[in-house]
């Protein structure tokens, strides 16, 4: 599972880092929310080495990556949520699908969750990996000016 996470984030980070080259850093929740609600493209980069494992089943890792926020929602308590999913291959060469969920609170605190399922059965593979991060500490957001 570590190999899957490392591969995924390596690819995503390279894409996001390239996109972030001409970008403005969104250093607070209000800046992030304003960029999204005014229709600006927003990219997030993740450095799980700066985040804290939130469960006993979640290992520490130095995995990094990123993704462009495609769709999002803001709930009544102000939490911003968005997700990403993609197919990849596990260490045994078998296809899997990964779901990545991001939840950002108005205070800037955040939770990153990864769940992997076997394909084509969608049977859960292992346990969820959950990390506690925050804006500017494990999660960085960028938008074009």
UniProtKB/Swiss-Prot annotation:
Keywords: Plasmid. It comes from the Bacteria. The lineage of its organism: Bacteria, Pseudomonadati, Pseudomonadota, Alphaproteobacteria, Hyphomicrobiales. This is Uncharacterized protein y4wH. Pfam families: VirK. InterPro entries: Uncharacterised_VirK.
